[in-house]
Amino acid sequence: MGRGADVVALLEPGAARSNLDGLDVECRDVDVTVAKHLEGVFDGARFCFHLAAKFGFWPKDPAHFYAVNVNGSRNVIGAAVEAGVERIVYTSTVATLGLWKTKAGQPSNEDDIADLSHLFGNYKQTKYVAEHEVLRLAAQGAPVVLVLPTMPHGPFDHRPTPSGKVVLDYLNGRIPGFVETAMNVAHVDDLAKGHLLALEKGSQGRSYICGGENVSMAQLLSILSEVTGLPPAKRRFPSTFPMIAGRLSQFIEGDLLHREPRIPLEAAQMASTTMTFDDSRARDELGYRSRPAAMALYESARWFADHGYVNAERVAQLHWNPPKESPPS
């Protein structure tokens, strides 16, 4: 919009649209799982950004993940190609990548393709299948570029996302300790710019990791302590702790009480996995740049606190210490 483009947002019927409030965006309700509903939707459009996916750790209807993430992706790209759209930017995820190198202390990149049988949970599995379907369509001529974001942090995290929930749990004093893992922290604004760079400079059928700074869990919690003034979580749990807690939560809350576990197994598996990534391809080929993790985490924490997500007792303890402004590098 800042470049003068007319923007149309295709939304799942009934989906929240608070992030679009006040923006000059035309919103249309479309069920992407039904190809017929997309007929004519892209007429007159030059570009398409496929940004959304079905996500969750405790799906009530696992088949709906496949319908949205796989069939929906196929339907959207098919309709866009049929309408003559010049370029499609498809948002995949680094969750489709193999992580064997991270065990040796090396970050994964776009060439580290996972084996589907090694991916845990409906989201990862359906995004993997969807990504390979998109690559197949690109090989057949669809003008698609793929962006693989890492862990997004920053403002406007209404739901919140799993990465945002880590920040929120810290703010509310719900992280008594941590497992020594690592992850890639990216500012959501940098990820948005990465999508625009993929539109402008990306090669058809090529995937680009857009990320930020690789940090350990201990570093992440230390940064949050520095920028908020809250005490750091210092207790270190063994690497097996998340999965043990997840299995107990699954059995008691999921199997016995038939409600969403507070610690879903998929979330537990992610919490015990090192997920570091190398975004050199996007930097070299697209000119992608990112800001430090401290800025992303500070803006995430500040937004949650300013919008009523943090309990009053903890808000009273906050003493903000913003990191020094620095341009993305």
Labelled PLM ranges:
Residues 119-122, 150-159, 176-189:
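Glycine-rich "substrate-gating" loop/helix at the edge of Rossmann-like oxidoreductase active sites
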Residues 8, 63, 67-122, 145:
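Conserved Rossmann-fold NAD(P)-dependent oxidoreductase catalytic core, especially the SDR/UDP-sugar
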Residues 75, 129, 162, 179-199, ...:
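Substrate-positioning beta->alpha
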Residues 92, 131-155:
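Conserved beta-loop-beta element that borders a ligand/cofactor-binding pocket
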Residues 14-21, 25-71, 79:
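NAD(P)H-binding glycine-rich loop region in Rossmannoid oxidoreductase-like domains
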Residues 4-15:
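Conserved glycine-rich Rossmann-like NAD(P)H-binding loop of the short-chain dehydrogenase/reductase
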Residues 194-262, 279, 295-329:
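Mid/C-terminal beta-alpha module of Rossmann-like enzyme folds, strongest
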